[in-house]
Amino acid sequence: NHIVLDPVMISKGGHHLLQNEAIAALKKDMVPLATMITPNIPEAEVLTGMTIRTDEEMQEACRKIHALGAKTVLLKGGHLAGAPNDLYFDGTEFTFYKGDRIETKNTHGTGCTLSSVIAANMAKGHTLTEAVEIGKMYITKAIQHSFNLGHGHGPVHHFYAFDESLKEGHISG
């Protein structure tokens, strides 16, 4: 049994979505149940009380979040300047997942999608690191194939693989 916890605590606009009591309950009651927690930088700053701007600060934040009881931590670095590198910590070793910044405003739901893909692949029997690697590949493609809907942050394209299969003739339409 695995639990992937995406602590959705802060909106794209920077507004806190949880009151202090809920954050305390999340840290005390939910994080210790997590096989993996997947905070972004602003969420990790709330969980740790620290400012995160460097790779070293990302590592320290992972240590602090791991100390709250999560088995593993995947700290998503997309909110930092430069390349959107994510950091995985299993309690012993750190692994950076390097990425290239994709110029798009269509990033709504990226964190939820990544954690869901990781959870689904863990349920399929993949190891934690395999699930993270599959999740990273999936979310990168979903962002690359995103499309504009409405105003502001648009969604990623969750069904990009289906569209690619149709174009390649693997699925008859």
Model-derived segments and their meaning:
Residues V46, T104-L128:
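Short, small-residue alpha-helix embedded
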Residues M9-S11, G77-A81, R101-E103, K136-I139:
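Glycine-rich beta-alpha junction loops
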Residues T51-M58, A123-E133:
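Short, charged, surface-exposed loops that flank catalytic or proteolytic processing sites
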Residues N20-E93:
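Conserved phosphate/ATP/ADP-binding segment of small-molecule kinases
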Residues T129-G173:
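Charged C-terminal helix
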Residues V4-K12, T38-L47, S115:
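Short beta-strands and strand-loop turn motifs
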Residues N1-D29:
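Glycine/small-residue-rich loop that forms an oxyanion/phosphate-binding "nest" at active or ligand-binding sites
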Residues F94-H108:
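Short pre-catalytic strand/loop immediately N-terminal to key active-site residues, enriched for Gly-Thr
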